[in-house]
Amino acid sequence: FAPDHVMAFDTAAPDLLSPVLERHPHMAFEAHSTDYQAPAVFPALARRHFAVLKVGPALTFACRQALYALDGLAGWLGRSGPSLAEAMETLMAGDNRYWARHYQGTAEELRLLRHFGYADRIRYYWPAPAAQAAVAALFATLDGYVHQGCSSAMRLLRGRPIR
């Protein structure tokens, strides 16, 4: 993947790399950041001697998506103080060590990549006290509302199998 797009592994492309290992049966390849690939790709990677399928930032990317979705809800509920995205932008703009070498572009492109890039460089900022405080403030804003919404959803599902 790249900061702004995912390159799908082409299972139909000629396998020019795997024959190298025919003389080295105890060796294998490592595929880096495979978590953005479609599940159907993994057997093809294994057949091509990619025995180590490393995952990358997809889990933290999904977590950020969920937090920002909740942040949008908090905006509708009239949160006090800055949004989570604003707090994270302040943090990342003030300390660029985790993203500056990974992203290029205009000021606006960099701002978008800091928050939404597939490399998910924002993940290195979540442990910071300011980020933790912003997440806590978000949850405090939503306290009661999310529980209320979940209770309504559970009443709708009662008696139905969860699929």
What are these regions (language model features)?
Residues 18-163:
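Flexible, acidic glycine-rich loops studded with aromatic residues
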Residues 1-6:
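Active-site-proximal beta-alpha loop/turn segments in soluble metabolic enzymes
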Residues 7-23:
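Structured alpha-helical segments in the cores of large, soluble enzyme domains
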